[in-house]
Amino acid sequence: MMTTDIQDGLQELDSLLSHADWQLADEVTFQIMLAVSDRRDAGWLDQSAIANFPCATLHQLDQRWLFYSSGRFGFSTQLHIYREAAERSSFEFSRQAGWVMNLWQPIGFFNFYHWLNFSLDAPQGHLPALWFWEMPWYRSWLIGGFGTGRGGGFGDPSLFDALMLRLERCQSI
């Protein structure tokens, strides 16, 4: 992705976040992530793309989400919750962030993306989320989804774990 494209995307993100348009901001965040990772054609992020995600862009995205949500949303907020939740179970973050529908305890299925709460009333760490939801239909089927992303599927923490590891490594830079 060209530097000017990144800057344009970040300016658009600033505008959306400043107007509390959380869902569109989430979509723009995902588009920036795809472009920076050279995954626009694929339309989703895999573990390799996350592992090689540029730290500078990750920090820029995170700082914007943190600033405009007063620390409620952002990758750093997710990392903080993830660290605490990991002591109990790998799926606990998803429950705390409101990403899971609790139909039967202790089993939970991921919400459909359009069921997420795109307001400041959402649980802490709820957004950004689209980067985690988007996946090809066949991967969705493999985790029990309906071919539309994570919705209705079981937990597959590998992608989220990859981003949390990348964020930890980027924080030390």
Located regions from the model:
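Surface-exposed peri-terminal alpha-helical interaction modules
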Residues: M2-I173
